[in-house]
Amino acid sequence: MKVNHTTACGTQPFDKTYSLGYQVHHEDWSPYPRVNRLRQAFLDRPYDIDVERLRLVTEAYQKHEDAPRKLKCARAFENILLNTKLYIYDEDLILGEIAAPAKASPIYPEFSVNWIINEILHSPFEERANDQFYIRNDEERKEIVELCRYWEGKTVDDLINSRLEIDQTKGSEVGEKIFQTNLYHYAGAGHLAIDYARLMAVGYNGLIDNAQAGLEKLSKRDPEYGDKRDFYTAMIIELEAAKKYIARYAKLAQESAEKEENPQRKQELETMALNCQQIAGGVPQTFWQALQLFNFATTLIQIESNGHSISYGRMDQWLYPWFAADMKNNTITKEFALELIEVQYVKMNNPTKLKDKGTVAVRNGRGFGGESLTLGGVDREGNDATNDLTMLMLEGSAHTRMMNPWVCVRMHENTPYELKIKTVECIRAGYGHPKLFNDAPSIKGMMRKGMTLEEARDYCVVGCVELDLAGKEYGWHDAAYVNTPKMMEMVVNGGRSLSTGEQLGPDTGSLDTYKSFDEVLASVDQQFEYWTDQMCSSLNIIDNAHRELKPVPYVSAFYEDCMISGKDLTEGGAKYNGIAPQAAGMATCADSLATIKQLVFDEKRYSGAEMLQAVKDNWVGHEKLYALVNSSKVRHYGNDDDYADDLFKFMFECYCRHISGRKTPRGGEFSPGVYSVNANVGMGLNTNASIDGRKKFEPISDNMGPVHTDGGSHDICGPTALVNSLTKVDHSLATNGTLMNLRFPQEAVAGVEGRDNLLSFIDEYIAKQAMHVQFNIMSSATMRAAQKKPEDYKDMLVRVAGYSAYFVELGKPLQKDLIQRTELHF
């Protein structure tokens, strides 16, 4: 059925480079009145906690207490889908939520409950400084606590904590916080992208047929027969439940249409009912149906498990056949296709996730993490893959300007000028999207993980900057954060804490004992080896706990190798099975090493003992040295100075070497990343003063960026020098990605000259083989104004790290960190 729609008001022809010029006011970002109203409705809703999923999953686990683990998980998923309340919102064109109302967070007791009980009883969610959530009434508050009590001692978190050794916990988030592995304590299978193209080609019926065939082929001679039988049986239960869930929506939409008096809305509801009827088991026949199937497939992953960063893959590629067919058949216009895209973008913001207060104090955000959408790049043959949908999806991001999706544009030497111009115009609009990825080093990095050239060319982005092969790789990205300045603390102080003196790691020397700078570098290597051993062994324990307690048969259905092998994603069923922790604070370490090398060993102006005492004293009483270390008289990373840049390269390569190649329980290898997202702020709160001129509690350096302390920014030579420093390392060694934030004020990129300067800068950046870059087009003055009058800047998006967020919802320490980042000019 074709639905008639009014043309978007004020849009220009689609052959123009950009059609954003019509807008004037914030409330009119989109040319589609429907989209603006849906966007505003989202902003006006409160962040609630919803009890229904907790109630239904607990009910199922109690009923099937003695069932095999995979079947117990499957029956819980089924119970949710058959009984959860359904929601259709006014003017919505895409159906499906995450077993909770829009903007309300479900509860996932399978992973952890102790913090939920504790916060409800002692520090209510609604009283947090940021990321507040609200429980609707005292009855539900009491019910949540009572239901969570059932799960005490039975969660993934409980199992992990029972297995960690004291040497591992010394360095973890419950100890000195040298590394933080807690994401997968409370989160499920995430940081992944499924094979949407496969689902679109065969539908749920096809997936069920594949699972049934796998079940029938099993041999009782297979020593894993029982596990594989349970896997296929659980998968079939969950896929059948998905069909019934979508059919429930079809029925609700039809019933709503019968009651609707507005002819236009009645027709929309009837079409949505037909869409759901078609895709409940079959394949989509239209672009609208393909989008609808996409939304159901994704939200069902978020119902099964609460994994961060369920990403959308190369959406302009796998969705294009349905768009092209509708355009050829004249059953859709570009205007209506864009409206559907924008409605879907708004809907992507509905899922929210309750997190513990410790996490949100340092890593703001109430969403499911990095739900990235990848556009552009090359195809499997190496040719440019840009199409009309690439342009529409990028434009839709500019019209909606919300936290999700996290739009990524892949760039290469033959990226069309039209796409580059549209990308630059989006960046100049100042809402923090898109982020850019360089195909050459990214593809090289994927091949380092063992992928073929054709596979590597098909990479997508998951989460912030993590590189992934959709439907083939379960990379366990974002597995841990490594606070490298805390490791440096062990280097300068003999493996002891600067604040307590406790011996935490091996004594590999200290600043008052080293006789040469080579001894310092050797100590860095030894400390990195020791602490990465502790972290990686901890991550293997966590990985095994997920395999034992929380298999994911539904999401496994979208991985062909899981279907063939009869192994769940958590058991190593994917083709590529990594674990990927990332390092934070590299520039803090590099500048610390440069300071030691210059002032202690080369110029001999200060002794190692004097430097050590300065950081023990938090620089108090050492003001002259503090000023010197933060001045241009000391060599710093970010200024195209090999003296300091070579030490950044040393740190980068040291970390990558100690992570790469380690084996995972799922038969894959560890993969290093170098980025902090916004965790550098929280890490700084737990890090003593450092030799680079950073005082205690200040943020460590962010991502691949230079140092910014209260004593001053260490990069002083402009953007070109910064890029030259950044590209002296081989980014492909960081096979889990690198991240670079850059900030320009609006006037630096204004007008044709500003646009062309930014475009030329990006071209140069790509040519020099940097892997990633993202921009904040925001002045310090604007951010300070938002701090003073947050009510006037409620929907002001800023680029934080791999994601954008509403500035006024960020914690004060993170706001300060954003303001302190160097304001660059061409």
From Swiss-Prot:
* Source species, domain of life: Bacteria
For this protein, the Enzyme Commission number is 4.2.1.177
Glycine radical: which positions carry it? 802
Record keywords: Lyase, Organic radical
Q: How is it modified after translation?
A: Requires the activating protein HpfH to generate the key active site glycyl radical on Gly-802 that is involved in catalysis.
Query: In what residue span(s) does the PFL domain sit?
Result: 33-695
Q: Name one GO biological process term.
A: alkanesulfonate catabolic process
- Please state what class of enzyme this protein is: lyase
Q: Could you tell me which residue ranges the Glycine radical domain spans? A: 706-826
Q: Which residues form the active site?
A: 464 (cysteine radical intermediate), 466 (proton acceptor)
Give the Pfam families listed for this entry: Gly_radical, PFL-like
Q: Which residues form the signal peptide?
A: none
Stored SUPFAM superfamilies: PFL-like glycyl radical enzymes
Pathway in which this enzyme or protein is active: Organosulfur degradation; alkanesulfonate degradation
> Where does the chain cross the membrane?
none
Lyase: is it a keyword of this entry? Answer: yes
Supply the InterPro entries for this chain.
Answer: Gly_radical (IPR001150), GRE (IPR051215), PFL2/GDeHydtase_fam (IPR010098), PFL_dom (IPR004184)
Q: Which PROSITE patterns match?
A: GLY_RADICAL_2, PFL
Write out the catalysed reaction. (2S)-3-sulfopropanediol = 3-oxopropane-1-sulfonate + H2O
From the UniProt record, which GO molecular function terms apply?
lyase activity
Give Gene Ontology CC terms: cytosol
What is the purpose of this protein?
Involved in the degradation of the organosulfur compound 2(S)-dihydroxypropanesulfonate (DHPS). Catalyzes the radical-mediated dehydration of DHPS to produce 3-sulfopropionaldehyde (3-oxopropane-1-sulfonate).
Protein family: Belongs to the glycyl radical enzyme (GRE) family.
Protein name, as recorded: (2S)-3-sulfopropanediol dehydratase
